Amino acid sequence: MATPIRWNQRGRVAPYGGSKRTDTPLRSLALSLTHVARAALSEPYMLTIEHKRIQLSRLPKTFDGFRVVQLSDVHHGPFSDREQIERAVETANRLQPDIIALTGDYISKERHYAAPCAEMMGKLKARFGVYAVLGNHDHWTDAALITDLFRAEGITVLVNEGMRFEKDGAAFWLAGVDDSMVGLEDISLALAGARDDEMKLLLAHNPIVLRRAVRASVDLVLSGHTHGGQVAIRGERATTRPRKRLLKGLWRQGNTQIYVNRGLGTVVLPIRYGCPPEISLLELRSK
């Protein structure tokens, strides 16, 4: 017959009846694993706001302080429910952004989640609009359906295309590429029409685009896809290998910077550890 257990005042497990047991390495390991499991199951609900100031030498002074809120990898489905997403939308709106950038993977694989996800994304509010690109999961599900639903909600979906973003006589180029993993990314097409000397902001789901963005003289790339690793065993900068280095946060290669958002949802398992879901508040500063 199993012995009931309780937590004593020091956080150790002891049997009812008053007798104390000496901790063993195995018991300590079991407690540690229990703690990790609880943290991993609760962390997907621990929404965080990452506020970064990004210096851009070609950003016109008119846009100094321009606020971009980025959301990524919503993955609406069994692991990412309406309550989580609606809370993220409300949080994003409270940040009063100039634009909102959505960087792909809105659903995981079930088409019936597309319409409610689009409805929730349609409640995002920004001074100059909401802009989106598609991710690999969107293509694996139904990219055309998601694109149509988002556009019906007033969201500008950029599919290898760009536009000149103008304000008070100043401008920069805002572009978005289709997903790299499905072989549809075309930076040249997205930047067609951009002037050589103007600041270029690129939305791309997969950060693997970075090297091509550098060659195309893009100033800033906003990406997602990685979920920050979803489970982080090592420190954030424990490795210098390029692909590992681009799991999350702000990085630079040459004159190009990239910000990789950890995303809101999860895949495979509904867990996160050391990688809480993120809303990015990116404040663009001119040098």
Predicted regions, residues:
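Active-site metal-binding loops of divalent metal-dependent hydrolases
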Residues: 72-76, 104-106, 136-137, 161-162, ...
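Beta-strand-turn-beta hairpins that frame and shape the catalytic cleft
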Residues: 47, 56-69, 155-156, 163-175, ...
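Membrane-embedded segments
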Residues: 62-156
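Conserved beta-sheet core of the metallophosphoesterase superfamily
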Residues: 152, 207-284
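Acidic, histidine-bearing metal-coordination/catalytic regions of metal-dependent phosphoesterases
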Residues: 1-68, 78
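Binuclear metal-dependent hydrolase catalytic cores centered on His/Asp/Glu-rich metal-binding motifs
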Residues: 148-155, 159, 167-204, 210-211, ...
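Conserved acidic residues
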Residues: 98-100, 105, 198-201, 219
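Mobile, glycine- and charge-enriched loop segments
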Residues: 46, 51-80, 177-204, 209
